[in-house]
């Protein structure tokens, strides 16, 4: 990259470094020259390696002190290189390292870009590299392109680091420790030199101030000689003289103290220089030891390689000795094997003749095996469909449970409505007595009084009582229909469960029969190989093969029938679930209609009560239209009740007929299928088999039938 590209790289990496959201400012180049933000970013990249101890070594309050900035940047650069070498196992060879002096003293953007490029390399190769790569992908396209080219440039200049022995690693650790101590001492030396420089500046300033004070003192002395004597403390010149004298003494004490501290810092600086020389000497000694350890390591590798060769040669010599000892035995065995070979040649000739005779039967056996494989695949498909039916059964059972809960809730609401209706009856009876007693003297005044009296007439009371009774009967009929529906659905589920268990047992019996037939086929193969030369045995084997093929065809037909039965059952399951959902929706709509009617009924009652309470001779003229509106609303509600009752009766009769038809069809189908399965089992276990085959099948069915049926029923009951 050119210098212009480096500046662009620095700007792009500045935007990337802001994605870490560190506490230190990191928006400009000057913010990053202190090194604090970069150190915090490194700690976020790997908090185990760049721990708190390492972070505490970075000075935060650097201000404009470029020496402290350079010290921080050196520590960060060393930490990045050590992290690449120790943790990532890479070493940057051809990459130009950043000049920390230019960064700290002049805020060079190109060198800062190199430093940020090294931090970028640590981020995309650490353990959380996916997170940082994703953050780069979310940035702008131009910034993303620059960052990707920087990563490619850095990776092209890295080489893997070879792992040394334990001694070399120990020397490496000691060398790093010494380098760290040396860097600490150098940083301390720089700090002390900076402090000495500051003290020198303070001494120079104090000396200038002292000279100015002396000049001022001299001027004052001359003035004092001209005007008043300085010995008189009451005169202003005497007081000024005393003040200047005390100030002079204080400044002298301050200069003495600063000179003493300056001497102390010089002594400390000399001690640190001595320590630096000692550390350098130790570093040189450790480097020589590291070179010696590397040479010893190479020698050890050579010796190890030669010792491996010696061990291999010794093992080869031992194996050759054993082979020579076994050679005589092998020669004797060769003679015996030649004799056996001649005998085996004669046997092979006879066996080849037998093999020619058995080839015809072998082709039939191969077709039989292929049919067995196809039957096994079909059986697995049937088991999958049975699992699907079991899942549908569980789902229907959950729906029944929810319907039961809804039924309980409706019962509780019915009880609460009963209580409210009884309370309303009591209130209406009391109000009827009050209104009949209060409206007697107003009977001959105006026609509006007669309308008010009609509100509480026995006709309205009878209508209210009749409506309450009808409401109660509708709720009772609704609960009865819910109970009948739940019982019918439960019976359907029980029948489906029984049929599913029967199909599972039949599938398991068919599987057992297939296994037995496969074992019989293997026995037939063995008998063909042993007795292929005998014609009578071959005829018997052919008959047995034909019998087994017939059994296989029968099993295949049974599986196809069961598959068709299961395919017929699946749409009926789906239709029943859809009907249940439709019934639930109708039930919800009816419940909402009932609630709306009850609310209207309560509103009408409250409005009638308010009219009766507010009724007096002065307001009789305005109550007529309201009472007429109430009567109209009561008539509309009666009509609505009648229409709802008719619709409810129609839907109830239609639903009962559909459920009865479904139950009868389901029961007839189950009986026919059960009868067919029993007839097939009786036909399959008939006289077509031999006595030994029937006995073997009877014992296997006695072993497998209880163990397969009982767990299925238990699991279904639990579900």
From Swiss-Prot:
The keyword Metal-binding does not apply. PROSITE patterns: CH. It is found in: Cytoplasm, Cytoskeleton; Golgi apparatus. Residues 679-719 are annotated as: Disordered. Gene3D superfamilies: Calponin-like domain. Keywords: Coiled coil, Cytoplasm, Cytoskeleton, Golgi apparatus, Microtubule, Protein transport, Transport. Interacts with microtubules. This is Protein Hook homolog 3. The gene is hook3.
């Amino acid at each position: 990259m050119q210098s212009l590209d480096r500046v662009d790289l620095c700007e792009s990496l500045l935007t990337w470094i802001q994605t870490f959201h560190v506490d230190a400012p990191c928006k400009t180049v000057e913010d990053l020259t202190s090194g604090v933000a970069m150190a915090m970013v490194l700690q976020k990249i790997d908090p185990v390696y760049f721990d708190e101890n390492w972070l505490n070594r970075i000075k935060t309050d650097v201000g404009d002190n470029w020496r402290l900035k350079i010290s921080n940047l050196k520590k960060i650069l060393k930490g990045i290189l050590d992290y690449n070498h120790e943790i990532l196992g890479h070493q940057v060879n051809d990459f130009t390292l950043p000049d920390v002096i230019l960064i700290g003293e002049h805020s060079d953007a190109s060198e800062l870009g190199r430093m940020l490029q090294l931090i970028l390399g640590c981020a995309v190769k650490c353990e959380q590299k996916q997170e940082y790569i994703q953050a780069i992908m979310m940035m702008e396209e131009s910034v993303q392109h620059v960052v990707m080219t920087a990563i490619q440039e850095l990776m092209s200049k890295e080489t893997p680091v070879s792992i040394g022995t334990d001694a070399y690693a120990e020397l490496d650790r000691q060398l790093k420790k010494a380098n760290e101590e040396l860097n600490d001492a150098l940083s301390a030396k720089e700090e002390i030199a900076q402090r000495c420089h500051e003290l020198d500046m303070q001494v120079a300033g104090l000396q200038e101030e002292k000279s100015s004070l002396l000049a001022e003192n001299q001027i004052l002395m001359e003035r004092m000689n001209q005007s008043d004597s300085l010995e008189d403390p009451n005169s202003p010149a005497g007081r000024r003289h005393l003040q200047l004298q005390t100030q002079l003494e204080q400044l002298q004490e301050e200069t003495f103290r600063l000179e003493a501290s300056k001497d102390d810092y010089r002594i400390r600086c000399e001690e640190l220089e001595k320590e630096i020389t000692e550390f350098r000497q130790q570093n040189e000694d450790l480097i020589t030891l590291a070179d010696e350890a590397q040479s010893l390591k190479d020698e050890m590798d050579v010796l190890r390689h030669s010792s491996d060769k010696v061990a291999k040669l010794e093992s080869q010599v031992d194996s050759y000795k054993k082979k020579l000892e076994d050679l005589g035995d092998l020669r004797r065995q060769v003679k015996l094997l030649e004799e056996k070979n001649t005998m085996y040649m004669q046997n092979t000739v006879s066996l080849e003749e037998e093999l020619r005779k058995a080839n015809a039967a072998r082709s039939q056996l191969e077709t039989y095996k292929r049919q067995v494989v196809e039957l096994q695949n079909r059986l697995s498909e049937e088991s999958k469909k049975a699992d699907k039916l079991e899942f549908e059964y569980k789902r229907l059972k959950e729906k029944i449970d929810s319907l039961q809960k809804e039924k309980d809730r409706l019962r509780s609401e019915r009880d609460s409505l009963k209580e409210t209706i009884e309370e309303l009856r009591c209130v209406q009876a009391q109000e009827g007595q009050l209104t009949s007693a209060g409206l007697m003297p107003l009977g001959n005044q105006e026609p509006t009084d007669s309308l008010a009296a009609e509100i509480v007439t026995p006709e309205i009371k009878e209508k209210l009582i009749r409506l309450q009774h009808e409401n109660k009967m509708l709720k009772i009929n609704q609960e009865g229909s819910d109970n009948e529906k739940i019982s019918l659905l439960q019976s359907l589920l029980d029948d489906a469960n029984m049929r599913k268990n029967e199909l599972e047992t039949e599938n398991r019996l068919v599987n057992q029969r297939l296994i037995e037939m496969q074992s019989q086929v293997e026995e037939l193969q063995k008998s063909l190989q042993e007795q292929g030369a005998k014609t009578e045995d071959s005829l018997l084997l052919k008959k047995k093969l034909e019998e087994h093929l017939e059994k296989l065809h029968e099993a295949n037909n049974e599986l196809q029938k069961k598959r068709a039965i299961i395919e017929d059952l699946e749409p009926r399951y789906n239709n029943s679930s859809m009907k249940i959902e439709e019934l639930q929706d109708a039930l919800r709509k009816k419940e909402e209609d009932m609630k709306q009617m009850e609310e209207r009924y309560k509103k009408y009652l409250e409005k009638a009560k308010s009219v009766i309470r507010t009724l007096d001779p002065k307001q009789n003229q305005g109550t007529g239209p309201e009472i007429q509106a109430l009567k109209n609303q009561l008539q509309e509600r009666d009509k609505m009740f009648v229409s709802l009752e008719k619709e409810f009766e129609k839907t109830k009769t239609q639903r009962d007929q559909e459920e009865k038809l479904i139950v009868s069809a389901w029961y007839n189908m189950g009986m026919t299928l059960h009868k067919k399965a029993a007839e097939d089992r009786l036909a399959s276990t008939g006289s077509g088999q031999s006595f030994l085959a029937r006995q073997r099948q009877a014992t296997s069915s006695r072993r497998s039938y209880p163990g397969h049926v009982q767990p299925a029923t238990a699991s279904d009951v639990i579900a």
